[in-house]
Amino acid sequence: MFLGEYQHIMDSKGRVVIPSKFRKELQQGCVVTKGQDNCLQILTKKSWSLLSERMADLPVTEKSSRQLRRAIFSGAVDSKLDSAGRIQIPENLRDYSSIPINGDVTVTGTGNTIEIWSSKVWKKIQNEADHEFANINEVKG
């Protein structure tokens, strides 16, 4: 399970250090793809297989299902950690996530997946989430 929030920098070659706590589960390789809210998602091969099966079950007759499949699969790349525990982020995914070369990134664990965010975007998303969480607690007790 992937937990926590970590600050890193995307290096000049488009690589991001993956926290050491996450590396063991990624030793057999992983898939990097587009995530919600302009983040990138890293999935283990097992999680990717499960997601692929769910995507295959979506009706091809629904436009939103086709668009979702296109977004997830066309942006996906097989990847592997290098000897320094870094993962290469291709240019198309850097553009999607608004993460510039030498830019600040936030790597978060979200249970079964890892998300990579532009730190600027992450702060905005996190502020919104914290506000919503506070409101949910007020309503639910």
Indicate where each model-derived feature is located.
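Flexible "stalk/tail and boundary" regions
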Residues: 1-8, 12, 22-79, 83, ...
